Amino acid sequence: MIKPVPKSLFKVDTPRGFFAGILEAGFTIFVLLIAIRFFNAPNYCKAILAAGSSAGLILSPFLMGLWGKSKTPNSIKCGILMASCAFLIFLASSTNQILFFSLLLLMAQICLSQVPSLMIGIYSQIYSKKERGFRFSLNLVLSTLGGMLSSYFLGRYLDLEFADHRIALWTMAFAALFCSLLHFCMPKPLGVPAVVNRLDLFRNIFFIPFKDRLFFRILIAWMILGFGVIMTFPLRIEYLANPNGLNLKNEEIALIAVSNF
């Protein structure tokens, strides 16, 4: 039976949740804010930045299928993805070309979006049913706390006259790199991971929702809600930041976004 010591995972996963919150807040708020106020980005670049996490979720089932026959532990896969995310963010901080900036951060968000589904597998292998909910919810609380604190301090910093937008990107890159190191330190399952048949995985993606009508309706509603959020999020950030809109400070935009969006 695959059952490493859950406490060792909990000790590593707790700080990971905090730094993952910093990274998520950065992608949700600051990449758009930087594109608008520091790059004066065209609309198509804002759309690329806003669609990154959704593109990652769409690709997730197919990437899971490609990795299905790999015996590499999920924690190692997460570590590689987060290291790739950190590298792409660092590259984005070194360019002045807005299209290159947007595409690099799009790829970084795709890498980040694969981690939650892999982490669910880690939790199910290591935590018991009784402790899984509490420890996962604590991770979410710490993630929210990390996002709130980073939004406040980075927002205040970007309001300074000498502010350099690369500091926000370097903070995100450091958070991703630290998460990567923590993933590599996570306990590995003692057994051999089950091999997933790729054909079965792809078949389940398309046919399982139709077998359960309630699940299918919830899935459709969730997708429609997601499309609404994705389409309007860049508009909300733009309205808060635009001189023809509310023209708020970066700190105010960050706090409003992290608390309401």
Task: Map each language-model feature to its residues.
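Structural signature of the two symmetry-related core transmembrane helices
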Residues: S75-F90
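Hydrophobic core of transmembrane alpha-helices in multi-pass small-molecule transporters
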Residues: F18, I98-V115
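Flexible cytoplasmic inter-helical loops of multi-pass small-molecule transporters
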Residues: P187-N204
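Glycine-rich segments within core transmembrane alpha-helices of 12-TM secondary carriers
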Residues: G56-S60, F136-Y152
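C-terminal membrane-cytosol helix-exit motif in multi-pass small-molecule transporters
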Residues: F174-V192
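Cytoplasmic helix-loop-helix junction between adjacent transmembrane helices
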Residues: L112-V141
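Helix-loop boundary and gating motifs at the non-cytosolic
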Residues: M1-I58, L214-I256
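Helix-to-loop junctions at the C-terminal end of transmembrane segments
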Residues: S60-P73, L158
